[in-house]
């Protein structure tokens, strides 16, 4: 198992500076990570730094709350794609899910999928804020909207990925979608347990430590 190819090398903290983004991209190339995952303001920088590599540029949309309106999420997505993003990690409207306004949740995702124009869309459902029924309905909405992945967490919602959540999400989407585990993955054992549970992508700021077999405290 080549762990590096499962990893979206992530830097989403609000105080991230250009030098840190440049380091993120250099590390991703050195260690052959699948992508870097950044906020939209850094997409152009990453696209330029990674243009001659196999590392993709992933960015977050509607992050971290998911509470912005659908039109804004679609615009952010279009701008990110135009600037060089190849994958989009969007946050659902969590309140709408809990209100059972499922048409809104689905249409919100669908608007981002359409704006992404064929590029991979991962749907962050923020599992730490959801009960089992919420999680199931969120995954079904993402599936119906035509997204490519469901993703556990933003890393900003008070909790991260768990094996049980990954198993549940995979059981709902089956072979029609993939699952990204993110938040709190700090060592190789955790990473492998998420993959064994059904995850095909891992979002973490600890990718180097993970592939080297260590563990780390703090971070995403």
Swiss-Prot record:
Gene Ontology process terms (BP): 2-deoxyribose 1-phosphate catabolic process; carbohydrate catabolic process; deoxyribonucleotide catabolic process
InterPro entries linked to this entry: Aldolase_TIM, DeoC, DeoC/FbaB/LacD_aldolase, DeoC_typeI
Location in the cell: Cytoplasm
Active-site residues per Swiss-Prot or TrEMBL entry: 89, 151, 180
SUPFAM superfamilies per UniProt: Aldolase
Pathway: Carbohydrate degradation; 2-deoxy-D-ribose 1-phosphate degradation; D-glyceraldehyde 3-phosphate and acetaldehyde from 2-deoxy-alpha-D-ribose 1-phosphate: step 2/2
Listed EC numbers: 4.1.2.4
UniProt-listed NCBIfam families: deoC
Protein name per its UniProtKB record: Deoxyribose-phosphate aldolase
Organism whose genome encodes this protein: Bdellovibrio bacteriovorus (strain ATCC 15356 / DSM 50701 / NCIMB 9529 / HD100)
Highest classification ranks of the organism: Bacteria, Pseudomonadati, Bdellovibrionota, Bdellovibrionia, Bdellovibrionales
């Amino acid at each position: 198992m080549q762990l590096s190819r499962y990893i979206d090398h992530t830097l989403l903290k609000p105080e991230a500076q250009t030098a840190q983004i440049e380091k993120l991209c250099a590390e991703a190339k050195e260690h052959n990570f699948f992508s870097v995952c950044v906020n939209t303001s850094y997409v152009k920088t990453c696209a330029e730094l990674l243009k001659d590599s196999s590392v993709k540029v992933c960015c977050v949309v509607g992050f971290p709350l998911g509470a912005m309106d659908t039109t804004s999420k679609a615009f952010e997505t279009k701008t990110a794609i135009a600037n060089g993003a190849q994958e989009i990690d969007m946050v659902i409207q969590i309140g709408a899910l809990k209100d059972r306004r499922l048409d809104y949740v689905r249409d919100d995702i669908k608007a981002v999928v359409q704006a992404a124009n064929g590029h991979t869309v991962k749907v962050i459902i923020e599992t730490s804020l959801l009960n089992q029924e919420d999680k199931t309905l969120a995954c079904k909405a993402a599936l119906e909207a035509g997204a490519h992945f469901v993703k556990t967490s933003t890393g900003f919602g008070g909790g991260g990925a768990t094996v049980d959540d990954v198993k549940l999400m995979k059981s709902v989407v089956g072979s029609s979608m993939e699952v990204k585990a993110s938040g709190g993955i700090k060592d190789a054992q955790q990473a492998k347990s998420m993959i064994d549970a059904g995850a095909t992508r891992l979002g973490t700021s600890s990718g180097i430590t993970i592939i080297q077999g260590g563990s780390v405290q703090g971070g995403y």
